[in-house]
Protein backbone atom coordinates (compact mmCIF):
# COMPACT_ATOMS: atom_id res chain seq x y z
CA UNK A 1 0.00 0.00 0.00
CA UNK A 2 2.35 2.60 -1.34
CA UNK A 3 1.76 6.31 -0.83
CA UNK A 4 2.49 9.49 -2.71
CA UNK A 5 5.32 9.72 -5.19
CA UNK A 6 8.40 11.53 -3.86
CA UNK A 7 8.95 13.04 -7.32
CA UNK A 8 8.65 16.81 -7.60
CA UNK A 9 7.35 17.49 -11.08
CA UNK A 10 8.55 20.31 -13.30
CA UNK A 11 6.12 23.22 -13.34
CA UNK A 12 4.64 23.64 -16.80
CA UNK A 13 1.87 25.61 -18.45
CA UNK A 14 -1.47 23.77 -18.54
CA UNK A 15 -3.20 23.23 -21.86
CA UNK A 16 -6.25 21.17 -22.78
CA UNK A 17 -6.43 18.42 -25.38
CA UNK A 18 -10.17 18.07 -25.65
CA UNK A 19 -11.33 17.26 -22.13
CA UNK A 20 -7.88 16.13 -20.99
CA UNK A 21 -5.67 18.61 -19.11
CA UNK A 22 -1.97 18.43 -19.96
CA UNK A 23 0.72 20.08 -17.85
CA UNK A 24 0.38 22.14 -14.71
CA UNK A 25 -0.94 19.99 -11.88
CA UNK A 26 -2.69 17.52 -14.21
CA UNK A 27 -1.91 13.80 -14.05
CA UNK A 28 0.59 12.59 -16.64
CA UNK A 29 -1.49 11.61 -19.67
CA UNK A 30 -0.98 8.31 -21.49
CA UNK A 31 -1.12 8.55 -25.27
CA UNK A 32 -1.01 6.04 -28.10
CA UNK A 33 -1.37 6.10 -31.88
CA UNK A 34 -3.48 4.08 -34.26
CA UNK A 35 -1.69 1.89 -36.79
CA UNK A 36 -4.75 1.14 -38.91
CA UNK A 37 -5.48 2.75 -42.29
CA UNK A 38 -7.21 6.01 -41.35
CA UNK A 39 -9.42 5.68 -44.43
CA UNK A 40 -10.79 2.46 -42.93
CA UNK A 41 -13.10 4.24 -40.52
CA UNK A 42 -14.55 1.10 -38.94
CA UNK A 43 -11.14 -0.45 -38.22
CA UNK A 44 -9.74 2.80 -36.83
CA UNK A 45 -12.77 3.39 -34.60
CA UNK A 46 -12.53 -0.19 -33.33
CA UNK A 47 -8.87 0.29 -32.48
CA UNK A 48 -9.53 3.59 -30.71
CA UNK A 49 -12.28 1.95 -28.67
CA UNK A 50 -9.87 -0.81 -27.63
CA UNK A 51 -7.33 1.83 -26.62
CA UNK A 52 -9.97 3.68 -24.62
CA UNK A 53 -10.93 0.46 -22.82
CA UNK A 54 -7.24 0.02 -21.93
CA UNK A 55 -7.22 3.49 -20.35
CA UNK A 56 -5.68 5.71 -23.01
CA UNK A 57 -6.17 9.44 -22.46
CA UNK A 58 -5.30 10.75 -25.94
CA UNK A 59 -5.01 9.03 -29.32
CA UNK A 60 -2.99 10.28 -32.30
CA UNK A 61 -4.19 9.47 -35.81
CA UNK A 62 -2.12 9.89 -38.97
CA UNK A 63 -3.79 12.14 -41.57
CA UNK A 64 -1.59 11.99 -44.70
CA UNK A 65 -4.03 13.42 -47.25
CA UNK A 66 -7.44 15.00 -47.73
CA UNK A 67 -9.23 11.67 -48.03
CA UNK A 68 -7.82 10.73 -44.64
CA UNK A 69 -8.92 14.13 -43.31
CA UNK A 70 -12.52 13.42 -44.29
CA UNK A 71 -12.25 9.96 -42.73
CA UNK A 72 -10.82 11.57 -39.60
CA UNK A 73 -13.93 13.72 -39.35
CA UNK A 74 -16.16 10.64 -39.39
CA UNK A 75 -13.93 8.90 -36.85
CA UNK A 76 -14.09 11.91 -34.55
CA UNK A 77 -17.88 11.69 -34.47
CA UNK A 78 -17.79 8.03 -33.42
CA UNK A 79 -15.33 8.09 -30.50
CA UNK A 80 -15.14 9.82 -27.13
CA UNK A 81 -11.40 9.99 -26.47
CA UNK A 82 -9.57 13.18 -27.63
CA UNK A 83 -7.86 12.82 -30.99
CA UNK A 84 -4.62 14.34 -32.25
CA UNK A 85 -4.22 14.67 -36.02
CA UNK A 86 -0.68 13.90 -37.20
CA UNK A 87 -0.01 16.20 -40.15
CA UNK A 88 3.01 16.91 -42.34
CA UNK A 89 3.67 19.07 -45.40
CA UNK A 90 0.14 20.09 -46.46
CA UNK A 91 -1.22 22.89 -44.29
CA UNK A 92 -4.67 22.56 -45.88
CA UNK A 93 -5.09 19.19 -44.16
CA UNK A 94 -4.60 20.91 -40.81
CA UNK A 95 -7.19 23.53 -41.71
CA UNK A 96 -9.68 20.84 -42.69
CA UNK A 97 -9.35 18.70 -39.57
CA UNK A 98 -9.63 21.87 -37.50
CA UNK A 99 -13.03 22.41 -39.13
CA UNK A 100 -13.92 18.79 -38.37
CA UNK A 101 -13.30 19.09 -34.63
CA UNK A 102 -9.77 17.83 -34.02
CA UNK A 103 -8.62 18.11 -30.40
CA UNK A 104 -4.92 18.75 -31.13
CA UNK A 105 -2.72 19.28 -34.18
CA UNK A 106 0.64 17.56 -34.33
CA UNK A 107 2.72 19.52 -36.82
CA UNK A 108 6.27 20.45 -37.61
CA UNK A 109 6.17 24.16 -38.56
CA UNK A 110 9.36 23.60 -40.53
CA UNK A 111 7.70 21.37 -43.12
CA UNK A 112 4.34 23.14 -43.35
CA UNK A 113 5.79 25.75 -45.68
CA UNK A 114 5.74 29.52 -45.92
CA UNK A 115 5.04 31.86 -43.02
CA UNK A 116 1.53 32.59 -44.28
CA UNK A 117 0.68 28.88 -44.24
CA UNK A 118 1.90 28.42 -40.69
CA UNK A 119 -0.04 31.53 -39.70
CA UNK A 120 -3.20 30.10 -41.27
CA UNK A 121 -2.84 26.90 -39.24
CA UNK A 122 -2.14 28.82 -36.03
CA UNK A 123 -5.10 31.13 -36.62
CA UNK A 124 -7.39 28.15 -37.18
CA UNK A 125 -6.12 26.53 -33.98
CA UNK A 126 -6.50 29.73 -31.98
CA UNK A 127 -10.01 30.42 -33.26
CA UNK A 128 -11.19 26.96 -32.21
CA UNK A 129 -9.16 26.55 -29.00
CA UNK A 130 -7.07 23.74 -30.48
CA UNK A 131 -3.58 23.15 -29.04
CA UNK A 132 -0.59 22.21 -31.18
CA UNK A 133 2.17 19.69 -30.58
CA UNK A 134 5.54 20.53 -32.04
CA UNK A 135 7.10 17.17 -32.82
CA UNK A 136 10.87 17.12 -33.37
CA UNK A 137 12.46 13.82 -34.34
CA UNK A 138 16.13 12.89 -34.70
CA UNK A 139 15.33 11.16 -37.99
CA UNK A 140 13.92 14.26 -39.67
CA UNK A 141 15.99 17.23 -38.57
CA UNK A 142 16.22 20.25 -40.85
CA UNK A 143 19.01 20.08 -43.42
CA UNK A 144 20.82 23.13 -42.06
CA UNK A 145 20.95 21.53 -38.60
CA UNK A 146 22.18 18.25 -40.07
CA UNK A 147 24.97 20.21 -41.77
CA UNK A 148 25.75 22.24 -38.65
CA UNK A 149 25.96 19.29 -36.24
CA UNK A 150 27.00 16.53 -38.64
CA UNK A 151 24.61 14.07 -37.01
CA UNK A 152 21.62 14.16 -34.67
CA UNK A 153 22.62 15.38 -31.20
CA UNK A 154 20.67 16.57 -28.15
CA UNK A 155 21.69 20.15 -28.95
CA UNK A 156 20.45 19.79 -32.53
CA UNK A 157 17.08 18.47 -31.35
CA UNK A 158 16.69 21.33 -28.89
CA UNK A 159 17.73 23.97 -31.43
CA UNK A 160 15.13 22.62 -33.82
CA UNK A 161 12.47 22.65 -31.10
CA UNK A 162 13.28 26.20 -29.98
CA UNK A 163 13.18 27.37 -33.58
CA UNK A 164 9.61 26.10 -33.85
CA UNK A 165 8.67 27.40 -30.41
CA UNK A 166 9.85 30.88 -31.40
CA UNK A 167 7.87 30.53 -34.62
CA UNK A 168 4.62 29.98 -32.72
CA UNK A 169 5.41 32.62 -30.13
CA UNK A 170 5.99 35.20 -32.88
CA UNK A 171 2.41 34.47 -33.87
CA UNK A 172 1.32 35.02 -30.27
CA UNK A 173 0.32 31.36 -29.83
CA UNK A 174 1.09 29.68 -26.49
CA UNK A 175 -1.17 26.62 -26.34
CA UNK A 176 1.31 24.01 -27.43
CA UNK A 177 3.38 21.11 -26.15
CA UNK A 178 6.72 19.89 -27.46
CA UNK A 179 8.49 16.59 -28.03
CA UNK A 180 12.14 15.93 -28.95
CA UNK A 181 12.29 12.24 -29.73
CA UNK A 182 15.17 9.99 -30.68
CA UNK A 183 15.62 6.23 -30.84
CA UNK A 184 18.79 6.53 -28.76
CA UNK A 185 17.91 6.68 -25.06
CA UNK A 186 20.77 8.96 -24.01
CA UNK A 187 20.16 11.40 -26.85
CA UNK A 188 16.46 11.69 -26.09
CA UNK A 189 16.95 12.02 -22.34
CA UNK A 190 19.56 14.75 -22.65
CA UNK A 191 17.49 16.63 -25.23
CA UNK A 192 14.47 16.66 -22.93
CA UNK A 193 16.61 17.76 -19.99
CA UNK A 194 17.97 20.70 -21.98
CA UNK A 195 14.57 21.67 -23.36
CA UNK A 196 12.92 21.52 -19.93
CA UNK A 197 15.20 24.37 -18.84
CA UNK A 198 14.30 26.54 -21.82
CA UNK A 199 10.50 26.54 -22.04
CA UNK A 200 7.46 26.40 -19.76
CA UNK A 201 5.19 24.49 -22.13
CA UNK A 202 4.26 20.85 -21.44
CA UNK A 203 6.59 18.14 -22.70
CA UNK A 204 5.40 15.02 -24.49
CA UNK A 205 7.85 12.18 -23.79
CA UNK A 206 8.76 9.29 -26.04
CA UNK A 207 11.62 7.17 -27.31
CA UNK A 208 10.83 7.03 -31.00
CA UNK A 209 11.03 3.78 -32.97
CA UNK A 210 11.91 2.05 -29.72
CA UNK A 211 11.51 -1.44 -31.17
CA UNK A 212 9.32 -4.49 -30.69
CA UNK A 213 7.25 -5.32 -27.64
CA UNK A 214 10.11 -6.51 -25.42
CA UNK A 215 13.01 -4.34 -26.61
CA UNK A 216 10.83 -1.26 -27.02
CA UNK A 217 9.35 -1.68 -23.57
CA UNK A 218 12.81 -1.86 -22.02
CA UNK A 219 14.16 1.17 -23.90
CA UNK A 220 11.08 3.23 -23.15
CA UNK A 221 11.03 2.25 -19.49
CA UNK A 222 14.69 3.21 -19.09
CA UNK A 223 14.49 6.50 -21.00
CA UNK A 224 11.12 7.72 -19.80
CA UNK A 225 11.79 6.42 -16.31
CA UNK A 226 14.92 8.58 -16.05
CA UNK A 227 13.02 11.69 -17.13
CA UNK A 228 9.89 11.06 -15.09
CA UNK A 229 11.98 10.40 -11.98
CA UNK A 230 13.46 13.88 -12.48
CA UNK A 231 9.98 15.40 -12.71
CA UNK A 232 10.14 15.94 -16.47
CA UNK A 233 7.16 15.01 -18.63
CA UNK A 234 3.46 15.78 -18.95
CA UNK A 235 2.32 13.19 -21.48
CA UNK A 236 3.94 9.93 -22.55
CA UNK A 237 3.72 7.63 -25.53
CA UNK A 238 5.43 4.23 -25.61
CA UNK A 239 6.32 3.64 -29.26
CA UNK A 240 6.18 -0.09 -29.96
CA UNK A 241 6.09 -2.20 -33.10
CA UNK A 242 3.19 -4.05 -31.52
CA UNK A 243 -0.52 -3.79 -30.78
CA UNK A 244 -1.08 -0.16 -29.68
CA UNK A 245 -2.98 -1.44 -26.63
CA UNK A 246 0.36 -2.74 -25.35
CA UNK A 247 1.69 0.84 -25.46
CA UNK A 248 -1.02 1.90 -23.03
CA UNK A 249 -0.36 -1.01 -20.67
CA UNK A 250 3.37 -0.31 -20.60
CA UNK A 251 2.75 3.41 -20.11
CA UNK A 252 0.63 2.82 -17.05
CA UNK A 253 3.10 0.29 -15.67
CA UNK A 254 5.89 2.87 -15.91
CA UNK A 255 3.78 5.49 -14.13
CA UNK A 256 2.70 2.98 -11.48
CA UNK A 257 6.29 1.98 -10.79
CA UNK A 258 7.12 5.62 -10.01
CA UNK A 259 3.90 6.18 -8.02
CA UNK A 260 2.95 8.92 -10.47
CA UNK A 261 -0.38 7.46 -11.49
CA UNK A 262 -2.34 4.39 -10.46
CA UNK A 263 -4.73 2.40 -12.59
CA UNK A 264 -5.50 -1.25 -12.04
CA UNK A 265 -3.47 -3.72 -10.07
CA UNK A 266 0.15 -3.22 -9.12
CA UNK A 267 1.43 -6.78 -8.83
CA UNK A 268 4.37 -7.57 -6.58
CA UNK A 269 5.54 -11.09 -7.41
CA UNK A 270 8.68 -13.11 -6.80
CA UNK A 271 10.50 -14.72 -9.75
CA UNK A 272 10.04 -18.08 -7.93
CA UNK A 273 12.57 -20.72 -6.95
CA UNK A 274 12.57 -24.26 -5.54
CA UNK A 275 11.19 -22.94 -2.22
CA UNK A 276 7.87 -21.98 -3.80
CA UNK A 277 4.81 -23.73 -2.38
CA UNK A 278 2.67 -23.02 -5.45
CA UNK A 279 3.35 -22.29 -9.11
CA UNK A 280 4.03 -18.54 -8.94
CA UNK A 281 4.50 -18.00 -12.68
CA UNK A 282 1.30 -19.82 -13.63
CA UNK A 283 -0.64 -18.05 -10.88
CA UNK A 284 0.58 -14.64 -12.01
CA UNK A 285 -0.15 -15.30 -15.67
CA UNK A 286 -3.71 -16.34 -14.86
CA UNK A 287 -4.33 -13.42 -12.51
CA UNK A 288 -3.07 -10.82 -14.99
CA UNK A 289 -5.44 -12.11 -17.67
CA UNK A 290 -8.43 -12.50 -15.36
CA UNK A 291 -8.06 -9.12 -13.68
CA UNK A 292 -7.20 -7.04 -16.73
CA UNK A 293 -10.61 -5.38 -16.53
CA UNK A 294 -10.10 -4.21 -12.94
CA UNK A 295 -9.30 -0.49 -12.90
CA UNK A 296 -9.24 0.10 -9.14
CA UNK A 297 -5.68 0.83 -7.92
CA UNK A 298 -4.64 -2.07 -5.69
CA UNK A 299 -1.32 -3.54 -4.57
CA UNK A 300 -1.36 -7.34 -4.78
CA UNK A 301 1.60 -9.43 -3.58
CA UNK A 302 2.10 -12.97 -4.86
CA UNK A 303 5.11 -14.52 -3.13
CA UNK A 304 5.93 -18.22 -3.29
CA UNK A 305 7.43 -18.85 0.15
CA UNK A 306 7.85 -17.48 3.67
CA UNK A 307 11.27 -15.87 3.14
CA UNK A 308 9.96 -12.55 1.79
CA UNK A 309 6.27 -13.39 1.60
CA UNK A 310 5.02 -12.03 4.93
CA UNK A 311 6.95 -8.78 4.59
CA UNK A 312 5.63 -8.07 1.10
CA UNK A 313 2.10 -9.22 1.96
CA UNK A 314 1.93 -6.84 4.91
CA UNK A 315 2.49 -3.90 2.55
CA UNK A 316 -0.23 -4.93 0.07
CA UNK A 317 -4.00 -4.63 -0.08
CA UNK A 318 -4.12 -8.36 -0.82
CA UNK A 319 -1.16 -10.66 -0.30
CA UNK A 320 -0.48 -14.34 -0.85
CA UNK A 321 2.41 -16.06 0.91
CA UNK A 322 3.34 -19.61 -0.01
CA UNK A 323 3.31 -22.16 2.80
CA UNK A 324 1.70 -25.35 4.03
CA UNK A 325 -0.97 -24.15 3.74
CA UNK A 326 -0.67 -20.80 1.96
CA UNK A 327 -1.63 -17.66 3.86
CA UNK A 328 -3.73 -14.74 2.61
CA UNK A 329 -3.23 -11.22 3.97
CA UNK A 330 -5.85 -8.47 3.63
CA UNK A 331 -4.70 -4.91 4.30
CA UNK A 332 -1.48 -6.23 5.79
CA UNK A 333 -3.10 -8.63 8.26
CA UNK A 334 -3.38 -12.45 8.09
CA UNK A 335 -6.89 -13.32 6.92
CA UNK A 336 -7.22 -16.97 5.90
CA UNK A 337 -5.36 -20.09 4.87
CA UNK A 338 -5.60 -21.63 1.42
CA UNK A 339 -4.48 -24.87 -0.17
CA UNK A 340 -3.34 -24.96 -3.78
CA UNK A 341 -6.76 -26.24 -4.84
CA UNK A 342 -8.68 -23.43 -6.57
CA UNK A 343 -5.97 -20.99 -5.45
CA UNK A 344 -6.38 -18.63 -8.40
CA UNK A 345 -10.18 -18.70 -8.22
CA UNK A 346 -10.19 -17.79 -4.54
CA UNK A 347 -7.49 -15.16 -4.92
CA UNK A 348 -9.40 -13.54 -7.77
CA UNK A 349 -12.55 -13.48 -5.65
CA UNK A 350 -10.75 -11.83 -2.74
CA UNK A 351 -9.10 -9.23 -4.97
CA UNK A 352 -12.40 -8.30 -6.62
CA UNK A 353 -14.05 -8.14 -3.20
CA UNK A 354 -11.32 -5.82 -1.94
CA UNK A 355 -11.65 -3.65 -5.05
CA UNK A 356 -15.40 -3.30 -4.50
CA UNK A 357 -14.81 -2.33 -0.86
CA UNK A 358 -12.28 0.29 -1.92
CA UNK A 359 -14.69 1.78 -4.46
CA UNK A 360 -17.45 1.95 -1.84
CA UNK A 361 -15.11 3.53 0.72
CA UNK A 362 -13.89 6.13 -1.77
CA UNK A 363 -17.48 6.97 -2.76
CA UNK A 364 -18.48 7.38 0.88
CA UNK A 365 -15.52 9.68 1.48
CA UNK A 366 -16.48 11.85 -1.49
CA UNK A 367 -20.11 11.96 -0.34
CA UNK A 368 -19.03 13.23 3.09
CA UNK A 369 -17.20 16.06 1.36
UniProtKB/Swiss-Prot annotation:
The family this protein is said to belong to: Belongs to the IspG family.
Binding site for [4Fe-4S] cluster: 270, 273, 305, 312
Leading EC class: oxidoreductase
Cofactor detail note: Binds 1 [4Fe-4S] cluster.
Pathway field: Isoprenoid biosynthesis; isopentenyl diphosphate biosynthesis via DXP pathway; isopentenyl diphosphate from 1-deoxy-D-xylulose 5-phosphate: step 5/6
Protein name, entry field: 4-hydroxy-3-methylbut-2-en-1-yl diphosphate synthase (flavodoxin)
One Gene Ontology biological process: terpenoid biosynthetic process
Source organism of this protein record: Pseudomonas fluorescens (strain SBW25)
Amino acid sequence: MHGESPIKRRVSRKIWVGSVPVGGDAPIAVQSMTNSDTNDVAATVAQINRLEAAGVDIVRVSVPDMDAAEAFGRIKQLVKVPLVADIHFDYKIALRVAELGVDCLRINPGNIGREDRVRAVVDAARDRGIPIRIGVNAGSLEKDLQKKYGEPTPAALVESALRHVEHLERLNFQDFKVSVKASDVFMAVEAYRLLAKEIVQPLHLGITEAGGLRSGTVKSAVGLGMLLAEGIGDTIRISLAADPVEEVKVGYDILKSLHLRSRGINFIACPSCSRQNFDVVKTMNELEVRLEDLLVPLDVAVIGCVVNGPGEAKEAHVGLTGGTPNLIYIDGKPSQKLTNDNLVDELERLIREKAAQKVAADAALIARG
